[in-house]
Amino acid sequence: MPKEVYFNKPQRLTQLIGANISVIVAGRRTGKTDSIAAPFVLRNMQRMPGSTGGIVVPTFKHGLTNTLPGLFAAWKRWGYIRGIHYVIGRKPPKTFAKAIIEPAEYEHVISFYNGSCAVIISQDRPGSSNSLTLSWLLVDEAKFIDYNKLKDETLPANGGIKSYFGRHSCNHSIMILSDMPQTQKGSWFLHYKDKMDSEVISAIEGLVYDIWKLKERIKQYKESGEEVSKHLIYSLRHKDKQLNQLRSIATYYKEYSSIENLQLLGENYIRQMKRDLTPLTFQTSILCQRIGIAKDGFYSSMKEAHKYDASDMEYLDNVAQSYYEDDDTHLSSICSHMDSRADKDTDPNAPICIGMDYNANINWIVAGQPSGRRLNVIKSFYVKF
């Protein structure tokens, strides 16, 4: 018996449009990973059996604690069980079909029963997209993605295998997800808005509606025991072909605030976020508003050179491996291990220096450890009035 699944408006539209390139800039808790990324990955792995795709995350830690839990939780609700329909981090069982291009190693690979694979590509792990031949890409938390690395290392790998999947509109497809960036470097994906052809998107919307009407007519004929005319079947096939062609050239760009998911979040969530977050973070991460960068502030003077990633890959790999080996382990258990041990810049034997900043509207504490002429800020806290 079919199971009803709820999707909000942004989630439904993204799936129905099905553009080859989709860029969704949406506020927190709009279900980007759960109900936009998860259907995208599942669709590609199902429609292109034996293909290989890439899930690009800014850091491996982020992938373990944010992206993968959202994907797996959604798949589980839809009946896809880890250990039965897919495995992660190990060679798939012999009952699974083989990938067209089998991975050299399966350490950070999701393997589906039909031979499809998804490689976890983390930008803080050098060379994680080397020598890959990919048929699709999911780019999560795009505002934290280094575009130069993506452009030079990963996008060229999204060449796919045209001889197998050339007829599919989802071949070479790209899904980019993020909330609104606050920095110029993190804004690299906003230009896709100018690449979207509104007429193509409108034509896709019209075809989706026409196909739905045709399917409803065919359904009515079958329920009444009448023979379905060949004209209806031909029309359905013709429109399906048109839809596939338009989707294969389409770029879809949309911006949504968290209010789009108000039915599930409730008004209290929005009020709480306005109270707890800084005004800038609330504007970008909840309301999804584009902002200018202030020129007279201290933080706007900080450059990309002031930022760094310091993941302890050996520790994270051990945590991930313990999860990969046990299909019954929930990913939430990983979060309990994500403390200072996952940070390579933390010296457990050195003192921690604390700095405080008392302000009229917000109080800060930052904790760091000096290292020569460098100060590694390992944690920050704030409270608003």
Place the predicted regions along the sequence by residue.
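ASCE P-loop NTPase helicase motor core
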Residues: F144-L264
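Inter-Walker segment of RecA-like/P-loop motor cores
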Residues: L64-T133
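A short beta-strand-to-loop transition that corresponds to the Sensor-1 phosphate-sensing loop
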Residues: R28, S122-D124, I176-Q182
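Pre-Walker A adenine-sensing motif
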Residues: P2-A19
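Walker B catalytic acidic pair
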Residues: D140-A142
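Nucleic-acid-processing active sites and adjacent nucleic-acid-binding tracks
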Residues: S332, S336-M338, D345-P348, V366-F385
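Conserved P-loop
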Residues: V23-K91
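ATPase catalytic-site recognition across NTP-hydrolyzing enzymes
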Residues: S248, E255-I354
